[in-house]
């Protein structure tokens, strides 16, 4: 009830204040409010000067604990004139520093070479460890096998086989000679076709016999050249092509 009474005094005083085009109520506004509410204003001085009144002491002033400031870098920016003083201060100057989120690519030749060499060394080391763990290894020390493992050397089953196999150059030369011989055979087979049709009967018979003989010789040469075993083939000199 007391709270509602005080609230009504404040609301009425505020309305009288605004009615007179003011923003803050004065003592006269409160007196008019009390009179309108039916309160005798003349009894207030006698009530205030009574002997058995209760004196309310002011609350003790306590010093607010000072919060320690964090590490500051630089001097904070002061508030402009349009910002009230009870607003918090501006943050430290390092708050506004821009920090790029990407790194510039390294373009120094020496740094790139060192980085490539270290990556290559790491790859070789990782591959060596993988081969040592998955395959057969040899150790430098007889007592401790796990120290300094080396990849075991695997000898060839037939060590003399590499000396007997022809090299790539010899295979290429053999293919060139085979292709040149086939071209010569096709030229000799197509030779009787250029004989004119106006020849007499004996000439046609001789041409047919010559064609049969060349075909038989070509088939024999082809059979001789088609040898599966490369070690049994006859030695052929490479054909030297002259530049035109």
UniProtKB/Swiss-Prot annotation:
Keywords attached to this entry: Cytoplasm, Developmental protein, Differentiation, Nucleus, Transcription, Transcription regulation
A Pfam family recorded for this sequence: Bromo_TP
Reported function: The TFIID basal transcription factor complex plays a major role in the initiation of RNA polymerase II (Pol II)-dependent transcription. TFIID recognizes and binds promoters with or without a TATA box via its subunit TBP, a TATA-box-binding protein, and promotes assembly of the pre-initiation complex (PIC). The TFIID complex consists of TBP and TBP-associated factors (TAFs). Mediates both basal and activator-dependent transcription.
GO biological process: cell differentiation; transcription initiation at RNA polymerase II promoter
Protein name: Transcription initiation factor TFIID subunit 8
Biased composition annotated in UniProt, kind: Polar residues: 208-220
CDD domains per UniProt: HFD_TAF8, TAF8
Gene from which this protein is expressed: TAF8
Annotated signal sequence range: none
């Amino acid at each position: 009830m007391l709270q509602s009474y005080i609230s009504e005094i404040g609301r009425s005083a505020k309305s009288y204040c605004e009615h007179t085009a003011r923003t803050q109520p004065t003592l006269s506004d409160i007196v008019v409010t009390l009179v309108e509410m039916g309160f005798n204003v003349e009894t207030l001085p006698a009530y205030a000067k009574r002997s058995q009144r209760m004196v309310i002491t002011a609350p003790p002033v306590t010093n607010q604990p000072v919060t320690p400031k964090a590490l500051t870098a630089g001097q904070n920016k002061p508030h402009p004139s349009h910002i009230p003083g009870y607003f918090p201060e501006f943050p430290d100057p390092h708050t506004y520093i821009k920090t790029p989120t990407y790194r510039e690519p390294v373009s120094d030749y020496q740094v790139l070479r060192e980085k490539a060499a270290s990556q290559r060394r790491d790859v070789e080391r990782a591959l060596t460890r993988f081969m040592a763990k998955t395959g057969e290894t040899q150790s430098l020390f007889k007592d401790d096998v796990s120290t300094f493992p080396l990849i075991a050397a695997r000898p060839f089953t037939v060590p003399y086989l590499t000396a007997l196999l022809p090299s790539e150059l010899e295979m290429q030369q053999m293919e060139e000679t085979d292709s040149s011989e086939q071209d010569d055979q096709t030229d000799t087979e197509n030779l009787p076709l250029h004989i004119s049709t106006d020849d007499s009967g004996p000439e046609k018979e001789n041409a047919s016999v010559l064609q049969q003989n060349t075909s038989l010789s070509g088939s024999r040469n082809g059979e001789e050249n088609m040898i599966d075993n490369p070690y049994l083939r006859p030695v052929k000199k490479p054909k030297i092509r002259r530049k035109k």
